[in-house]
């Protein structure tokens, strides 16, 4: 139906927007303290960007992208994630030109064709950061801490942080061979997707939700046994930095990310009560992505957090902010002359920083008082024929059930001072 939003999308109505803006305020405040600048990229990109960046053969590229041809027969895709877009912007706009570390953050909609359920929508929102140009393990730790601080700044508790290293091009082939040797015996019992992954990307077998409970999965080789000395040292230093910062974590040698570009550090923060959708943030290092997209070799690390899941976690812990009242002041005008006199007062109040509302339909006193109550306004200003003749207005304190008369000449000044107390 034309009056229904497409499946997997959702309207965010005024009574819910306050929670979103609260989360976004925390994000912007935190990123300012960490020194990250906001970037806004297009919602669609050339399809090849994601094919090369995320990787052919990944579930995202093969099954989940919204891809279409425009009128110029160019293949375009609604962004399924934003790291590839951020790297493209980094290259196109020569953000690397000063040779320094670039620290970026974003908030925006992403799109994946998936089975809609709580915490998993076809249009969903992410907050993420990308730090490009530095390979220090301290930067990995900073990014992990930023993700963790974001969630705890919202008041969330009961979070788990899992950590792993997925190696580098020097040591990952060894692990790939060990995985293929191990899973060869179980190949007939793997799901169809994992049978395909066995040849193309056996690491992603470890990320399979369907085969996760198979008893043989627990015996799969751990990548930590295959890391080269450089990756081992890097991973140990990341852990040392996190320990020094007082953040608890759990090593998970089978934690891999579902995108091909990750190298070395991989992490995931979960809120277990959300069940199957418990992962609220995750990321890692992607030292080869900039080069893969046409740039010079550039180390980089980042993460993304799913805001729908974050809001679900906040709701479960009763941490959603209270909806503020719609108005501070409600003007009640009785009669046409009073309505004409009230309108410029309404504008003056708003210009003075007061949230002010007024009924334009000429309803009765009783009906307008009901509107004032529904708006949550602390004060109702009543202007009728008698008040207009005396050049005054009645100011009713809705909380104290008290009222006083105020001269119109001083009304705006009085209300501004009362509201700002």
Where are these regions (language model features)?
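TRNA-recognition modules of translation machinery and tRNA-sensing kinases, especially anticodon-binding
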Residues: 1-421
